[in-house]
Amino acid sequence: MARNRFKGLGVALVTPFTPDGEVDYPALKRLVNYQLDNGADFFCILATTGEAPCLTTEEKDRITETVKEINRGRLPILKYCGGNNTRAVVEEIKHTNWEGIDGILSICPYYNKPSQEGLYKH
């Protein structure tokens, strides 16, 4: 029987930016280490606070790999893969390197408001 790895204090990591609008990877590393040192039970990456809709695929990949590299399997990681475009969500899921990621956080399409059948198919 599978155990629920996502329990306790889950931290939705923010994506820090430099004043020029670039992802601040040194600051991201400090944030991950801070949470590891201060009692987090799992990470949620690239969700709303992680600015996923505003990031390129390359930035999301590098953020994912940076968090995995620092975490080294110590805490479970939940990765956000969601949006209104089902095809794009499926492509992101296929594209992601899932080694070191323990689950997917997704959402129902919120803009185009599909039917129940549409939600099921999404």
Question: Where in this protein do the model-derived segments appear?
Answer:
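Active-site beta->alpha loop and helix N-cap motifs at the rims of alpha/beta catalytic domains
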Residues: A2-H122
